[in-house]
Amino acid sequence: KFSRNLVDKFNMKINIAYGRINYIKKFSISDSLFECKGNINLLEEYPLLFFDCSIISEDNQKLLKKFSIKIKNKAEILNLKVSGNLNILNKKINLKKININESYVASNEDLKYFKNVFENTIFDESFLKIFSLEKIKEFILEVS
């Protein structure tokens, strides 16, 4: 079961002009800070949602516990950065880069693996289903 009070704080800024949406979204879960910024041009035939996201957590155990995931390792700092784009109509993701704690940079092979896992676990239904906590948990378990 998931906690009903998953998100502690939430802030979103949206700018809409000439068919383009620019956004900045910031929220926190268990003292972990999430930030995503990007844009989408809705006038394109196949609109792409570009994103540049980060998660900064002083205690990865505390964060994962919110998703009902237990890890045996000691609590560690997590600094995750991900950028890429989503093709909402075709349910595809393209990952440009993934960095973890400045010590791991995903190779092209790793990016393909994460893309396949994302599309097969999270993006296998409608766009709105990618925000399902159960699907996020499934993705985390698959890639860890």
Predicted stretch roles:
Residues 1-143:
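Small-residue helix/turn framework positions
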